[in-house]
Amino acid sequence: MRKIILTGDRPTGRLHVGHYVGSLRERVELQNSGAFDDIYIMIADAQALTDNADNPEKVRRNVREVALDYLAVGIDPAKSCIFIQSMVPELTELTMYYMNLVTVSRLQRNPTVKAEIQQKNFEASIPAGFLCYPVSQASDITAFKATHVPTGEDQEPMLEQTREIVRKFNDIYGEVLVEPDIVLSTNKACLRLPGTDGKAKMSKSIGNCIYLADSPKDIETKIMSMFTDPTHLRRDDPGHVEGNPVFTYLDAFSTDEHFAAFCPEYSCLQEMKDHYTRGGLGDVKVKRFLNNVMQETLRPIRERREYWEAHLEDVQDILKAGCEKAENTAAKTLSEVRRAMRINYFEDGNLLK
């Protein structure tokens, strides 16, 4: 079986470091590994409209921002197909067919959907499109017969819902669709990076993010104001590293080379953690080290973004070519689905016979 990746992001804002360690960094590594036959990376504008229907300009504007972020982190259009969801109409048709294979109660039980409904205050009035977006995700994944989906752990319920739809479709109509596997980062700190305010999740809407496109000054300001251990009031106080966002970020980003370059009194992160835990290490010093780490990590990303911002016509050409390739692939899958469902009425000329 061909090994195929499908992944993507909603264009509701610029991408942040949570996206980077949660999936973007992994995507670049997978892209460059040569282990996959095809890689599709989707800008999910149609999905973004499920809770931004009254603000389409926001979605339109951020299609550009997400495309620039993809290219900035190292997504290579020669190796990965970057496309816009709404420019592949076959996905909408597949969604309609799949909606007959899932119940409303099952959609309401999806933990990811339940959490997002609460976060967006949709309890009293849930847009139908928002409730059904797991079905749309199933269409996105199966249209390209994706075998692997790199994403965050909070999306596992979505992948399981896709697998359920695939199994039900194949059971009724025959073996057409492929069940996908999730690809998670091996670094546990990367699975869900907390916000700079200590909240469990970094969120564009809450504003507790460090963006990939942030200036050096903005990065420094956000890091130096980060939440830490509230019981660590003085430098000599014993501190806690568990649940401390500064150390969670260091888990996700720092390397021994960073210590050699910026904090040579420690050979590795564990030595710094041990010192902080027993007392004698202040938060300011730890934050300054984290700032050096983040500046070095984000500098090349920001420089590549500036290059592509100066070549927007090339970015548009990349997106157009990606959409054409994605539509051709999705059309083939849709044809197989119609044939399996016996709704390919004029394909063989036997409709009325």
Model-derived regions, located:
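Conserved nucleotide- and phosphate/pyrophosphate-binding catalytic cores
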Residues: 157, 163-353
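Active-site-proximal beta-alpha loop/turn segments in soluble metabolic enzymes
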Residues: 49-52, 143-147, 201-202
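Structured ligand/cofactor/substrate-binding pocket environments in proteins
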Residues: 15-24, 40, 55-62, 78, ...
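N-terminal Rossmann-like or analogous alpha/beta NTP/dinucleotide-binding catalytic cores
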Residues: 2-139, 257, 296-298, 305-306
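Pocket-edge structural micro-motifs
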Residues: 7-9, 84, 145, 195, ...
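N-terminal amphipathic alpha-helix/helix-capping segment at the start of soluble metabolic enzymes
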Residues: 1-2, 328
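Residue-level "edge-of-site" marker
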Residues: 83, 149, 351
